[in-house]
Amino acid sequence: MISLTASRKYRHTRQELFEAIDSVQKLARIKRELENFRVARSETGLQIIDARFGFIVVRFDTRLRYATWPDRSTELKQIKGRMKQYLCTYTIREEGSECEVVIDLSIKLPYGPVGFLVSLLAKPLYAWRIGRELKLLDKITVK
């Protein structure tokens, strides 16, 4: 199982940060795993997408739910697929003149002990990826 948390403070407002990730199309600009996806359903605050996640050498077809709570948080969660669990939340907290974005990522792979060993090897890669997402979020946020 991969379970990671990373955070970063920004000099942007909560609204500016949320606008950068308020839809799955915008989130795909910073989350590279979402390069090839298809929106199956879209409404305010909820999008259902079909995606293919590449995990090292294995590809997982999955259906994801992208839920948003305006100016507070977003959640990308697997609702159907071969992975045992995929959950990524983005929480925006206001602290004085700065805002902090916290990313929580949780992935459980199938394949029993082999999946566990692969997840141990992949954990540093995913730590680097969510760090990169936080840096990209700063670049694409409109001031």
Where do the language-model regions lie?
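Beta-strand elements of well-folded, non-transmembrane domains
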Residues: 10-12, 53-57, 68-70, 82, ...
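A short, structured loop/turn motif at beta-sheet edges
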Residues: 11-14, 41-43, 67-72, 91-100
